[in-house]
């Protein structure tokens, strides 16, 4: 099992990053709350990973902190929650925000996440609220970690930041029309792809 990677970032296309380690490029899916914390292309990064093997694919999911991986692994234990939905959940909320929402049984906040309906939100609360008591130490994330930052430094603007932002939101589980509406709502001159995704996810909560 691949549990940790250290390498050079070759490409960043949210929610996926291509990391080169010893001449091998690994495609890693990351929650947007982790993606924002990555260094720029060409720089070194360390990512904690969870390896998923399916009949039709082998997928790597990556996290900046071990605690975020612990929460991801707890999420995919919930009935009806697979890796892609867990990725979307942790893209819409930081680990601490999600834990707080579950502990406070904030169903209305949870249903705003992509792919989460009322039944799934209720199931998340019922199945996960008691797990946090035994995992409080493992799930503790240092203050500021995993939170959506106020600003993102990006040296280069993609040719179509709005299009890339919409594609990233669709990959996270939003319907194309909804993703387009979310991006249009927060679009402004000078915004890059990551800024648009960040602001769209913020506005959705």
Swiss-Prot record:
Main location (coarse class): cytoplasm
Region spans: Domain II: 65-143
Localization of this protein: Cytoplasm
Keyword Cytoplasm found: yes
Renumbered residue ranges of the record's region Domain I: 1-64
CDD domains: UBA_RuvA_C (cd14332)
One GO MF term: four-way junction DNA binding
The keyword Ion transport is assigned to this record: no
Coiled coil spans: none
Any single GO BP term: DNA repair
Region (Flexible linker): 144-156
Region span, Domain III: 157-205
Subunit structure: Homotetramer. Forms an RuvA(8)-RuvB(12)-Holliday junction (HJ) complex. HJ DNA is sandwiched between 2 RuvA tetramers; dsDNA enters through RuvA and exits via RuvB. An RuvB hexamer assembles on each DNA strand where it exits the tetramer. Each RuvB hexamer is contacted by two RuvA subunits (via domain III) on 2 adjacent RuvB subunits; this complex drives branch migration. In the full resolvosome a probable DNA-RuvA(4)-RuvB(12)-RuvC(2) complex forms which resolves the HJ.
Family of this protein: Belongs to the RuvA family.
Described function: The RuvA-RuvB-RuvC complex processes Holliday junction (HJ) DNA during genetic recombination and DNA repair, while the RuvA-RuvB complex plays an important role in the rescue of blocked DNA replication forks via replication fork reversal (RFR). RuvA specifically binds to HJ cruciform DNA, conferring on it an open structure. The RuvB hexamer acts as an ATP-dependent pump, pulling dsDNA into and through the RuvAB complex. HJ branch migration allows RuvC to scan DNA until it finds its consensus sequence, where it cleaves and resolves the cruciform DNA.
Domain observations: Has three domains with a flexible linker between the domains II and III and assumes an 'L' shape. Domain III is highly mobile and contacts RuvB.
Protein name as catalogued: Holliday junction branch migration complex subunit RuvA
Species this protein is from: Sodalis glossinidius (strain morsitans)
């Amino acid at each position: 099992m691949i549990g940790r990677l250290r390498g050079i970032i070759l490409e960043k296309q949210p929610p996926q990053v291509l990391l080169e380690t010893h001449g091998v490029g690994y495609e890693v899916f990351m929650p947007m709350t982790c993606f924002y914390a990555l260094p720029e292309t060409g720089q070194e990064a360390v990512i904690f990973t969870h390896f998923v093997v399916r009949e039709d694919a082998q997928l790597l999911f990556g996290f900046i902190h071990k605690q975020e991986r612990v929460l991801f692994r707890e999420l995919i234990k919930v009935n009806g929650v697979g890796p892609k939905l867990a990725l979307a959940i942790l893209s819409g909320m930081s680990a601490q925000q999600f834990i707080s929402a579950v502990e406070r049984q904030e169903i209305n906040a949870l249903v705003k996440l992509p792919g989460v309906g009322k039944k799934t939100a209720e199931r998340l609360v019922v199945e996960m609220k008691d797990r946090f008591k035994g995992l409080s130490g493992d799930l503790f994330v240092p203050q500021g970690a995993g939170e959506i930052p106020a600003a993102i430094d990006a040296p280069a603007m993609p040719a179509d930041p709005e299009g890339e932002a919409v594609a990233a939101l669709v990959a996270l589980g939003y319907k194309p029309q909804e993703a387009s509406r979310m991006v249009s709502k927060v679009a402004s001159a000078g915004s890059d792809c990551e800024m648009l995704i960040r602001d769209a996810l913020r506005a959705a909560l």
